[in-house]
């Protein structure tokens, strides 16, 4: 890489109350040995519930290499990222997915002469996490990034991004106004009133900025032209969190370009425009030429005056200084050369990565042909599969059902079949289609009586909805789940199933990879003998796996004949089950039910309240308001917080005042959670923890 930032080299450490067990020690050892011996592609075939996530974390700890983990969708990426943050709390675990909550790409339909403007809704929190991932990668080696295929899309050059980075330290000579100009050049905006992420404000000799990848603000205090002090502070309360002798501040956009680079880009865009206009006019496409001239001239003016324009990514080839046809810079370019790639659910993710380029290219080709974009817009694209392979090194493929591609690359798979809990793969029962609904109803009632749950998978949406209506009429608490159900509702339904508010979910293709439901003891597969994508060997194995987290897990396939896919799935499940039974008998293990916490923000609040109460009962009970009076507590204005902080410093009993502040912030945390401001509640929780740590130190010191 062409930039020079010294990365902090901190060891990867897994912090877990558990040790590797079952097949995990053998799998970790074999994976690590193969990678250390230089094998480029290694496959871990891990049965559902065997702890593939923990195995991956221990593998990273063993290899001590920065790691990229690619997931097939945002939901699984978020789930895995949360698990890794628990397993590696002291390392930089980042989340990198598309920041669009809604995205309608720019498109043109020639048949109806319809132009569709790009329309999108950006999620600010996800954008912050993307910037946090790139900032971590450039400053630390102990990085794990959990991403989706978003990581193969263009992102601007790491050299330019790092080159525009600002390094500040106490005692440094820099003029305040020069610093403000640097912030503007890095695409930060000045806003002295609404102080939010990506903005800075000035108060006399004090400059405050919230980097686009941070939740805390940075305060830079000047004495003349010298930086006197640097601190991080809570942007809401104004409380100083920590003193920072030095800081790195990265640009507010990944598509940032210096003056020289921008000047060169403007020149090459004009040259390409002139050439393309001439070409279109020779072909008699006057309308297309006029359209392209008007749109590109406007974009050039915006780039000249502001440094950015709508759809700036379409000019990324010029801004990066790349040759025509060359691949874009992506997140992969931000990693050190020795990074490890882990592809989770590889049977889904590998084809997904390979398919991204063509879909993007066909849409852009139409835009270019009809004068909506310059031909260089074609180079703002995802990586092609061969380009992706050139940029990655050693790869671990994880799946319960590895695809033919990865099986063909690897010299035998590493198996992880034995579960640490001793749980077995479910029994499989094949029953005739005739009378299947009444038989299913009887099985569901038996599960409901035992306080267990059931999943039913159908082939069509209509069938899912009709079956749901039928079960509802017979008093079963049931909901359906298919592609028309939005993501938030999907998460809510799965939570309701785990809590027992509903007993059955009927779905189509959504009950497969990564669904972690220990309460489910029955999985019913209707029309199991209808061959196709939803009833292939891999789909059946994944669906069967949903019942593998319960001691009494059973799978019922309703079919009049046994297809080849069914036979393979049954044989593989029986093979795994026999191996698991033999291991349990040899080691005297009784299968234990998997107890998985139903995570909730209320759990976090309750846990924090217990800890706070225990601490404050040590002599600070009169501080603040008595009892739980968090309803309606206003959030502190930053100015009031500054005043409050000064009062605490002047007070004769600092510990007492600190306890008072902890109570106030606890009340604010509850208020934020009730208003569904979970990000704010989490920030307040973190600050409360810091203050409690300080109070404990004071108590221990006898203050």
Curated annotation (Swiss-Prot):
Show the GO MF annotations. Answer: ATP binding; ATP hydrolysis activity; DNA binding; excinuclease ABC activity; helicase activity
Q: Name one process (GO BP) from the record.
A: SOS response
Domain named Helicase ATP-binding: which ranges?
33-190
Record carries keyword Zinc:
no
Compartmental location: Cytoplasm
Q: Where is this motif: Beta-hairpin?
A: 99-122
Binding of ATP, residues? 46-53
Instruction: Please tell me one Gene Ontology term that the record gives under cellular component.
Output: cytoplasm
Keyword annotations: ATP-binding, Cytoplasm, DNA damage, DNA excision, DNA repair, Excision nuclease, Helicase, Hydrolase, Nucleotide-binding, SOS response
Ranges of residues in domain UVR:
659-694
Q: Where is the Helicase C-terminal domain?
A: 436-589
| Broad class of the protein's primary localization | cytoplasm
Q: Which Pfam families does the protein's record reference?
A: Helicase_C, ResIII, UVR, UvrB, UvrB_inter
State the similarity comment. Answer: Belongs to the UvrB family.
PANTHER family from the UniProt entry: UVRABC SYSTEM PROTEIN B
Purpose: The UvrABC repair system catalyzes the recognition and processing of DNA lesions. A damage recognition complex composed of 2 UvrA and 2 UvrB subunits scans DNA for abnormalities. Upon binding of the UvrA(2)B(2) complex to a putative damaged site, the DNA wraps around one UvrB monomer. DNA wrap is dependent on ATP binding by UvrB and probably causes local melting of the DNA helix, facilitating insertion of UvrB beta-hairpin between the DNA strands. Then UvrB probes one DNA strand for the presence of a lesion.
Mind telling me which HAMAP family this protein's record contains? UvrB (MF_00204)
Q: Quote the protein name from its UniProt record.
A: UvrABC system protein B
User: What species was this sequence derived from?
Assistant: Bifidobacterium longum subsp. infantis (strain ATCC 15697 / DSM 20088 / JCM 1222 / NCTC 11817 / S12)
Higher taxonomy: Bacteria, Bacillati, Actinomycetota, Actinomycetes, Bifidobacteriales
């Amino acid at each position: 890489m062409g930039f020079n930032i010294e990365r902090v080299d901190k060891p990867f450490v897994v912090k877990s109350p558990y040790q590797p067990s079952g097949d995990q020690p053998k799998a970790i050892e074999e994976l690590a040995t193969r990678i250390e011996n230089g094998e480029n592609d290694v496959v871990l075939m891990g049965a559902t519930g065997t702890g593939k996530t923990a195995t991956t974390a221990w593998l990273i700890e063993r290899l001590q290499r920065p790691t990229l983990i690619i997931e097939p969708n945002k939901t699984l990426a978020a789930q895995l990222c949360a698990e890794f943050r628990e397993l590696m709390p002291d390392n930089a675990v980042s989340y990198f997915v598309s920041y669009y909550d809604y995205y309608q790409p720019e498109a043109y339909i020639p048949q109806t002469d319809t132009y569709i403007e790009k329309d999108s809704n950006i999620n600010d929190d996800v954008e912050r996490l993307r910037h946090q991932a790139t900032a971590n990668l450039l400053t630390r080696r102990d990085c794990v990034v959990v991403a989706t295929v978003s990581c193969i899309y263009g992102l601007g050059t790491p050299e330019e991004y790092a080159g525009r980075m600002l390094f500040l330290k106490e005692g440094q000579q820099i003029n305040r106004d020069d610093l403000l100009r640097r912030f503007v050049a890095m695409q930060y905006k000045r806003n002295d009133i609404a102080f939010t992420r990506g903005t800075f404000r000035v108060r006399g000799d004090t400059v405050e900025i919230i980097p686009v990848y941070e939740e805390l603000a940075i305060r830079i205090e000047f004495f003349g032209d010298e930086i006197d002090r640097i601190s991080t502070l809570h942007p809401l309360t104004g409380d100083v969190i920590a003193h920072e002798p030095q800081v790195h501040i990265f640009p507010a956009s990944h598509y940032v370009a210096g003056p020289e680079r921008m000047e060169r880009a403007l020149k090459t865009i004009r040259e390409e425009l002139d050439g393309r206009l001439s070409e279109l006019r020779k072909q008699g496409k006057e309308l297309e030429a006029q359209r392209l001239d008007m749109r590109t001239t406007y974009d050039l003016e915006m780039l000249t005056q502001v440094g950015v324009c709508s759809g700036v990514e379409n000019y990324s080839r010029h801004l990066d200084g790349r040759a025509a046809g060359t691949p874009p810079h992506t997140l992969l370019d931000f990693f050190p050369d020795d990074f490890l790639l882990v592809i989770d659910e590889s049977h889904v993710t590998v084809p997904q990565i390979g398919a991204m380029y063509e879909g993007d290219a066909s849409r852009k080709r139409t835009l270019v042909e009809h004068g909506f974009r310059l031909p260089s817009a074609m180079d703002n694209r995802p990586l092609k599969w061969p380009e992706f392979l050139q940029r990655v090194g050693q790869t671990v493929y994880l799946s319960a059902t590895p695809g033919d591609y990865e099986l063909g690359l690897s010299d035998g798979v590493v198996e992880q079949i034995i579960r640490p809990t001793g749980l077995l793969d479910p029994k499989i029962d094949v029953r005739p289609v005739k009378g299947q609904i009444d038989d299913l109803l009887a099985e569901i009632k038996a599960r409901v009586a035992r306080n267990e749950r059931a999943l039913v998978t159908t082939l069509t949406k209509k069938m899912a909805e009709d079956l749901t209506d039928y079960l509802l009429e017979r008093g079963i608490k049931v909901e359906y789940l298919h592609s028309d159900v939005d993501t938030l509702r999907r998460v809510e339904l799965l939570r309701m199933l785990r809590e027992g508010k509903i007993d059955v979910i009927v779905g189509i293709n959504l009950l497969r990879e990564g669904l972690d439901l220990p309460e489910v003891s029955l999985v019913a597969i209707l029309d199991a003998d209808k061959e196709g994508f939803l009833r292939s060997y891999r789909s059946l194995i994944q669906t069967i796996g949903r019942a593998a987290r319960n001691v009494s897990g059973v799978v019922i396939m309703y079919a009049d004949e046994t297809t080849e896919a069914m036979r393979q799935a049954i044989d593989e499940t029986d093979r795994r089950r026999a191996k698991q039974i033999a291991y349990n008998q040899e080691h005297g293990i009784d299968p234990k039910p998997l107890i998985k916490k139903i995570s909730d923000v209320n759990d976090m609040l309750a846990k924090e309240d217990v800890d706070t109460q225990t601490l404050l009962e040590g002599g600070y009970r009169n501080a603040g308001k008595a009892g739980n009076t968090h309803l309606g507590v206003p959030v502190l204005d930053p100015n009031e917080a500054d005043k409050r902080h000064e009062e605490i410093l002047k007070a004769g009993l600092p510990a007492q005042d600190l306890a008072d502040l902890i109570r106030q912030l606890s009340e604010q945390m509850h208020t934020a959670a009730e208003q569904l401001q979970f990000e704010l509640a989490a920030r307040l929780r973190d600050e409360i923890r810091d203050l409690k740590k300080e109070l404990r130190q004071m108590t221990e010191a006898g203050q």
